[in-house]
Amino acid sequence: MTTTTSSIQDSSAAHTQNNTQPNDSTGTNTAAKNSAHVPLRVIIDNLSTNEGEVEIGVYTPENKFPDEKDKFKKYRFQPKSEQIDVLLEDLPYGELALAVYHDENNNGKIDKNFLGIPTEPYAFSNNFKPSFKAPSFDNCKFSYNEQNHVVRISLLNKRKPTK
């Protein structure tokens, strides 16, 4: 297992990728095998501020969704407006789920109240809105492939957007 950290710029956000890449049964790094894939385009809207960073956690069926410590990969972006539009590369085709939060105070974690409910804006793929418990992978999964490679997510905000 290798860990890599890289930083790139795109037109909509500063991007930092921190991930762990598993090897497949042949010992080949799966990210290298998947590098020819169409990137996953993620459009996130309803950001209330440009402060902090937006974190996207990517989960496969093998991960404990939405466990913050068991992500397949994570990406962090500096928002420049009320929406970010980013490309996530080196992901395997198949079923994935995304957990997103806006780390407004940039402390590297999602802040929660005494009940464990997030106090910073957050969202999940399929725009699943949890009620009294965390969502399951099945609630948020989608099929990522060459034909299906765009995901739109609206953050659940705790306050009104500022202009």
Model regions and ranges:
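Surface-exposed loops/turns
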Residues: 49, 80, 92-93
